[in-house]
A protein has these predicted regions:
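C-terminus-biased signal that marks the final domain/tail of proteins
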Residues: 1-13, 127-130, 135-136, 145-147, ...
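A contiguous strand-loop segment
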Residues: 1-94, 126, 313, 323-328
Length: 330
């Protein structure tokens, strides 16, 4: 399962957790402007906006999990198993396979408004990448500094929903997730008053009691509520370090620890990586399950007019700083 979120301070930030029981060998992948993106149902995007994000590169093609383009439009795909239904190929339509959905939108659209227009005419198909890599059942969070939408391809068509909560998890479908927030309208970061009865001398015995009832389990419905509550009440400084640090704390509220979510006997879902990007500056930050230090790759330090993918392996070895090591300044 996964969780994605947006966050606005002086800059605009977005990112996600990838929660799964195994890795496909994810990398930080930059698709420069002149890398040819061959579309499965015809046509090649010879030139496009530069993109940075996490992807599995298969047969030279970047299968993006999440990414942001040089203009500040970002997108993340999250599991939507059992609910996602894609269209069949339709002649005389722009047919886009789900695995090329992220590079198609981010490669051609500079803003959320432009992406909304593109979605009016796209036909999203379930064409598999290969026999080894069938179509993933996904829905997507798409956002820039102007707002966020959720895209779901379901039995009755492609749906685009405004997302005022600024978060997305997995099932159930997004309208149900938003409706369920009504059950938690009493939650608050403030300490509660005794509204139970004037006849009872009820007292506060702990801090944080305003959020009693906030779900704490790992289900996607509970993570949606917890991520929304945490994001909407987060407070941080406006600077880069404060903003990035707070974003990782927001997603830290829903990260999964190895051993707590068994998917098969002896196999456990865990947060393989957490990402955060500064959409304005094109900086992609991440941590991994086995390296909690924040690493970063900056889009604009590369040759964005190149024609080959630029790839950085994720850092997965724990990096511990010894403050009292000889010659070390704390």
């Amino acid at each position: 399962m996964c969780t994605a979120a947006t966050y606005q301070t002086r800059g605009f930030y977005m990112g996600r957790t990838l929660d799964y029981e195994f890795s496909y060998g994810e990398e930080i992948v930059i698709t420069p402007r002149r890398f040819p993106i061959a579309l499965r149902h015809g046509g090649v995007m010879d030139t496009h906006y530069a993109i940075i994000g996490t992807a599995h590169v298969a047969d030279g093609f970047p299968l993006y999990y999440d990414a942001v383009n040089e203009k500040g439009l970002g997108m993340a795909g999250l599991n939507f198993v059992g609910s996602a239904q894609y269209a069949e190929v339709v002649p005389d339509r722009e047919n886009i396979a789900q695995f090329e959905f992220i590079p198609r939108l981010l490669g051609r659209c500079a803003t959320l408004a432009e992406a909304r227009e593109a979605l009016r005419t796209l036909n999203l198909t379930g064409t598999p990448f290969s026999e080894r890599l069938p179509a993933s059942q996904l829905h997507w969070l798409l956002a820039d500094k102007s707002g966020a939408v959720v895209i779901e391809s379901v039995a009755d068509g492609l749906k685009v929903y405004d997302d005022p909560a600024g978060v997305l998890t997995n099932n159930p479908p997004f309208p149900q997730q938003m409706f369920a927030l009504n059950n938690f309208m009493h939650l608050s970061p403030k300490q509660p008053e005794n509204l139970f009865s004037d006849a009872l001398p009820l007292t506060l015995y702990s801090r944080g009691m305003g959020a009693l009832g906030l779900p704490g389990d790992l289900s996607s419905a509970s993570r949606f509520v917890r991520a929304a509550f945490t994001r909407l009440h987060s407070v941080s400084g406006e600077g880069e370090a404060d903003s990035v640090g707070q974003f990782f704390h927001i997603l830290g509220a829903v990260e999964q620890q190895n051993g707590c979510c068994e998917v098969r006997p002896g196999e456990y879902e865990r947060t393989i990586y957490t990402s955060c990007w500064n959409a304005d500056r094109g900086i992609y930050y991440y941590t991994t399950y086995t390296n909690r230090r924040i690493s970063a790759v900056e889009l604009r330090r590369e040759d964005l007019d190149a024609a080959a993918l630029i790839r950085y392996p994720m850092r997965t070895r724990e990096d511990i700083f010894y403050q009292n090591a000889p010659g070390t300044e704390s």
